Amino acid sequence: MAEKRDYYEVLGVSKNATDDELKKAYRKKAIQYHPDKNPGDKEAEEHFKEVAEAYDVLSDPQKRSQYDQFGHAGLGGAAGGGFSGGGMSMEDIFSRFGDLFGGFGGFGGFSDMGGGSRRRVRRGSDLRVRVKLSLADISKGVEKKVKVKKQVVCSKCRGDGTEEANGKTTCQTCHGTGVVTRVSNTFLGAMQTQSTCPTCHGEGEIITKPCSKCKGEGVEIGEEVISFHIPAGVAEGMQMSVNGKGNAAPRGGVNGDLIVVIAEEPDPNLIRNGNDLIYNLLISVPLAIKGGSVEVPTIDGRAKIRIEAGTQPGKMLRLRNKGLPSVNGYGMGDQLVNVNVYIPESIDAKDEQAIAAMENSDSFKPTDAARKDIDKKYREMLD
């Protein structure tokens, strides 16, 4: 599966599917491709991982929101995250979602995958970083690197948490399963419930000789430089995940994610409005009267535009496709040039004579039609 399919397509649901619809769709697909049902079938195993990856994203509100905004790019797939990219093993999938198979012909547990154990796989906490982007970065997309201080696998025990190879013993409370079973009598008959073992906290083992460096936690504080791609068109406050680049989990669990929060740097010339960019152009009175050409800054450099003779203050010119791309890859914004006329606060004697001559010219006297046009524009603004 060289190219990732749409997650909604993988599960066979619509983009407004509810949590219950997602769960039902995942159960159906997972049972169809379950390794117990398709022994030795590598293609079925890949489909099984694919539906698990899709459900992992769509069942998490934050990840689903990121996916809906950015697609696969917003989940940090290029940085090595996800199931098929090596982020989670088959055992991790069963541990995380195994309870969803209950009542379906015995699927669930670990069956042939893990010797009947249901030990809990811990997950490391997520990290958050704020990344500042210029409009130029946002217009094209950009590769970024951040250096973070985080929990990493202990360099001495390699995450095992023990001082030596035989530093663990099987938990006597749950006998290594990670869960305890309780049977209670009710008016409906005997009811069996399972819960995480309180002694080993779901790990199935007790550390008897903890690592002297990490004190048995399996993690230590370290630093890592993380690279990731930010797609074009992102906006202030948007978030994306880099899978598996958060804190390491204690004793061999699954890493958390790195949550990248987008921050826009103010541009000295351009103002963003959605996918459009606005430039406030100030022209002289003679240019507004006679017309002419002028250069304006754009996201790609400078562009020459034509000012028509008699241009009024507040006129908006549009440069097609000179704005920002849509974050989902469809469509491009425009650049709007808001034309304003500069009125000097003071003038010299020579200019006063020129203006005095203008005052007596009918060309410079406001017309009733011009006043009505301004009135119309204000009414449209108020509606």
UniProtKB/Swiss-Prot annotation:
GO terms for biological process: chaperone cofactor-dependent protein refolding; DNA replication; protein refolding; response to heat. It is found in: Cytoplasm. A zinc finger (CR-type) spans 141-223. One of its GO terms (cellular component) is cytoplasm. It holds the Pfam family DnaJ. InterPro entries: DnaJ, DnaJ_C, DnaJ_domain, DnaJ_domain_CS, HSP40/DnaJ_pept-bd, HSP_DnaJ_Cys-rich_dom, HSP_DnaJ_Cys-rich_dom_sf, J_dom_sf. Zn(2+) 1 binds at residues 154, 157, 211, 214. Binds 2 Zn(2+) ions per monomer. Transmembrane segments: none annotated. Keywords: Chaperone, Cytoplasm, DNA replication, Metal-binding, Repeat, Stress response, Zinc, Zinc-finger. Its main location: cytoplasm. CXXCXGXG motif repeats lie at residues 154-161, 171-178, 197-204, 211-218. The J domain is necessary and sufficient to stimulate DnaK ATPase activity. Zinc center 1 plays an important role in the autonomous, DnaK-independent chaperone activity of DnaJ. Zinc center 2 is essential for interaction with DnaK and for DnaJ activity. Belongs to the DnaJ family. The grpE-dnaJ-PG1777-PG1778-PG1779 genes are co-transcribed and may form an operon. Homodimer. This is Chaperone protein DnaJ.
